[in-house]
Each structure stands twice: as structure tokens, then as C-alpha cells.
């Protein structure tokens, strides 16, 4: 899972992820932004579910993050729409609406994001 952190013209951090993990980048860009307390909550949840049968999820404005002891899933909330609710001819590109990754890989990205943000 490759990633890149960039700063836009306003100084905001943007995350770009490798193909198949784009949704992880969208989650950082849309849900986290400058809200590092959300990362605190996610890291605490990861410690809670790691090595257990439990799972945790948090629905945001655009994306929902779900994790169990081994993996993290981030999905666009729009995936809750049924096919009947979509306009004719419209469909969602699932690669950019759902992403799965290992817990350790995800936590490495979180740590790298924190480090990048702290280098303002």
C-alpha cells in the first residue's frame, strides 16, 4: 500500500493512495483533515480490537471506517444506496468506494500522516 502526502496551496494536507486503496486517502482527506482527535479515537479502537473477535466502526459524513482484529475497511456511505435509488445509467466505481487493508499497514499510514502534519 503506497501513499503520498502533499500540501495544497492553502497548506492543507492531501493524501494520495495507490490503486485499490484510494478510499483510504479519501477518508483522510474528507473525514480526518485537521481532526487529529479522530486519529486518536481510531488508534484507541485498534488497540481495543487487536487480537480479539470484536469489531469497531465509526460513520463519518462521507465515509465509514470499520475494523476488526486484523483488517480495516473504509467505504463510502453512498454504498448504502440500493440500485433502485440511483439514476438510470449511474453506478459507483467500487474501487473508489471501498477499500480493505491490514491493520498494521493502516496504522503505519496513520503514524506517517501524524508525522507529516506535525512538520508544518
UniProtKB/Swiss-Prot annotation:
The UniProt transmembrane annotation reads none
- Classify the source by domain of life: Bacteria
Q: Which residues form a coiled coil?
A: none
Query: InterPro entries, from UniProt?
Result: UPF0231
Q: Which family does it belong to?
A: Belongs to the UPF0231 family.
Query: Which HAMAP family has this protein been placed in?
Result: UPF0231
Name the UniProt record assigns to this protein = UPF0231 protein YacL
Q: Which organism is it from?
A: Salmonella heidelberg (strain SL476)
Amino acid at each position: 500500500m503506497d501513499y503520498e502526502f502533499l500540501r495544497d496551496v492553502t497548506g492543507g494536507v492531501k493524501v494520495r493512495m495507490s490503486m485499490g486503496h484510494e478510499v483510504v486517502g479519501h477518508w483522510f482527506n474528507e473525514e480526518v483533515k485537521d481532526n487529529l482527535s479522530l486519529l486518536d479515537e481510531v488508534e484507541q479502537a485498534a488497540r481495543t480490537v487487536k487480537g480479539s473477535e470484536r469489531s469497531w466502526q465509526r460513520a463519518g459524513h462521507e465515509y465509514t471506517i470499520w475494523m476488526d482484529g486484523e483488517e480495516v475497511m473504509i467505504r463510502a456511505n453512498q454504498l448504502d444506496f440500493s440500485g433502485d435509488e440511483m439514476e438510470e445509467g449511474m453506478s459507483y466505481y467500487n474501487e473508489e468506494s471501498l477499500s480493505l487493508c491490514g491493520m498494521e499497514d493502516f496504522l503505519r499510514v496513520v503514524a506517517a500522516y501524524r508525522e507529516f502534519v506535525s512538520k508544518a
